[in-house]
Structure formats: structure tokens, C-alpha cells
Regions:
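Extracytoplasmic small-molecule ligand-binding "clamshell" domains
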Residues: 21-97, 155
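Periplasmic-binding protein-like
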Residues: 30-32, 110-115, 189-225, 248-262
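Bilobed "Venus flytrap"/periplasmic-binding protein-like clamshell domains
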Residues: 31-34, 42-55, 118-157, 162, ...
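Extended ligand-binding regions for polar small-molecule ligands
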Residues: 46-58, 120-123, 135-136, 210-244
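Ligand-binding clefts/hinges and TM-proximal coupling segments of bilobed small-molecule sensing domains
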Residues: 62, 143-153, 228-262
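Acidic, polar ligand-binding/catalytic clefts
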Residues: 66-131, 144-145, 202-203
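Short helices/loops that flank or line small-molecule/ion binding pockets
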Residues: 67, 72-85, 160-183, 187-188
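A ligand-binding cleft/hinge motif common to bilobed small-molecule-binding domains
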Residues: 88-99, 173-205
């Protein structure tokens, strides 16, 4: 009887550890980085949110989103091991020693590219960051930019206002993420018309986005890399990106089609 009782107790105690081992929680913040992470009305979506859901179907463990947190708290939770994944950041963005010692990095998932945009007919030669010396560049308040030591910032409160600033010639150029630009033009009809007033130039800066894995779950690095390779190879990743960066074509009303053929 005692042996049976002890066995039951052992199983009950071991069950939470088994559940924990079969689940990886990933960090989510309550600040948007469109179109990579979109936090709106308490709901989370975006390219990287969809990527994590796609990877969940490829792995034997369950990937579970944490409750959205302020960015610094999300990093604290990772450092403490309360979340075990962060998708997706460049290695250079997490150089704090306390973060470095608990971080393992996946293979690159995708690149994030910042491009320079110009008012129409006002492009200037650009080959390196030093070419921005003395220029006025439209930026978003609170964002960091490679090469900012060379140019004078003209801050806007958000990316929509930034596009307007460039279109109206209030700065000589602007710097914006390439996919963010495509997303804004595809999903915001109120600014889509401004595309003709903006000329896209070359890439200014490129970051390699990887999944950060907590060192306590090192055994998951190889399966994670294999899953990333699969969603890249089978087109899943490309389809996710297109979902957020290509305009949705309006579907014609069948009755309208038939009446127009009469």
C-alpha cells in the first residue's frame, strides 16, 4: 500500500516537470514593430507571430506565447528563464553581459533591411553611411538608426507621419524598414496614394534576425534550426511575408460580373 501511494505521489510531482519540458514559452511585447509584430486591441499578429505558429507545427514541443509585456520586462523574463525563446532579433541587439551568458542563437531566419527613401526627383548618390554626412533625414522618434552620427534627424511620431514628411519634402530623405514600407503601402489606404511621391533607394543597413534560445534549453537548438530550414525551403516563410506586404485584391461581386456581361 505504501509503495503504491509513493508511486502516485512521485507521478504527481513529476507531471509539472514533464509539461514544462515539453513546452517552450516565447516572449511577446506590448509594443508593435510592424509588420514583424503587431499589437493592437490586445491582439498579437504579424510576420514573426505567424512564424512562431508555423514553427510550432514543425517541432515535437509546444511553442506557447507569453502574455505581452513591456520590452524591458520581456528581456528580464528571458534572462531569468521564465521565457525560453525570443523571436526574432539580431545578435548585436542583445549585448548586455547578463543576456549574453544565457543566450544561444539559431541560424538566421530572415534579414531586416532598412532602405533610404527620397522625395520624387531628389535622389542623391548613396554607397556608404558617410554619404549621409550633413543631410536631413526623416526618422521616427525613439528609434535608433545606423549612421545617425552623420546626419541631422527630422523626427516624426510614427512611420505614417514619416512617409508624409518625405513625400512633402520636409527632409532630404528618410530611412525605413523595407518590409514596413511595403506593409504600410499595402494595408493603409490613406497613405497608399503617396507611393507615387516616394522613391525607394538602396539598402542602408541590414540585420540578421535569429531566434534567441535560453541556454537552459540547449537541446532544442538543433531541432529549432531544422524547423527554420524547413519553413524556408517549403515556401512557408515567403507566404507569411507576402501576407503582410502585398495589397489585398478586392473580390468582385459575382452579380456585378454577370450584369456587366449583359
Amino acid at each position: 500500500m505504501n509503495s503504491w501511494f509513493m508511486r502516485v505521489v512521485f507521478l504527481l510531482l513529476a507531471f509539472p516537470l514533464t509539461v514544462q519540458a515539453s513546452t517552450l514559452r516565447y516572449a511577446v511585447t506590448n509594443e508593435s514593430w510592424e509588420p514583424y509584430w503587431i499589437f493592437r486591441d490586445g491582439q498579437v499578429s504579424g510576420i514573426l507571430s505567424d512564424v512562431m505558429q508555423a514553427l510550432d507545427t514543425q517541432l515535437e514541443v509546444t511553442l506557447e506565447a507569453d502574455t505581452p509585456q513591456p520590452p524591458l520586462r520581456a528581456q528580464k523574463y528571458f534572462r531569468e528563464g521564465l521565457v525560453q525563446l525570443e523571436c526574432c532579433v539580431d545578435i548585436e541587439w542583445r549585448t548586455d553581459p547578463e543576456q549574453v551568458k544565457v543566450s544561444l542563437w539559431s541560424d538566421p531566419l530572415m534579414s531586416s533591411e532598412e532602405v533610404i527613401i527620397f522625395p520624387p526627383g531628389r535622389q542623391f548618390a548613396f554607397a556608404k553611411l558617410q554619404d549621409l554626412q550633413g543631410r536631413t533625414i526623416s526618422t521616427v522618434r525613439g528609434y535608433g538608426y545606423a549612421g545617425s552620427q552623420y546626419f541631422a534627424r527630422v523626427d516624426s511620431p510614427n512611420s505614417t507621419a514619416q512617409l508624409n514628411s518625405v513625400a512633402l519634402g520636409r527632409a532630404e530623405a528618410g530611412i525605413i524598414d523595407r518590409l514596413e514600407l511595403a506593409y504600410l503601402l499595402a494595408s493603409h489606404p490613406e497613405i497608399g496614394g503617396r507611393a507615387v511621391k516616394i522613391e525607394q533607394g538602396p539598402v542602408v543597413n541590414r540585420s540578421e534576425l535569429r531566434i534567441r534560445l535560453h541556454s537552459s534549453r540547449a537541446e532544442m537548438l538543433q531541432p529549432l534550426n531544422a524547423a527554420i530550414a524547413r519553413i524556408r525551403a517549403d515556401g512557408t516563410l515567403s507566404k507569411i511575408v507576402q501576407r503582410y506586404t502585398q495589397p489585398v485584391r478586392p473580390q468582385l461581386n459575382p452579380s456585378a460580373i454577370s450584369s456587366s456581361n449583359r
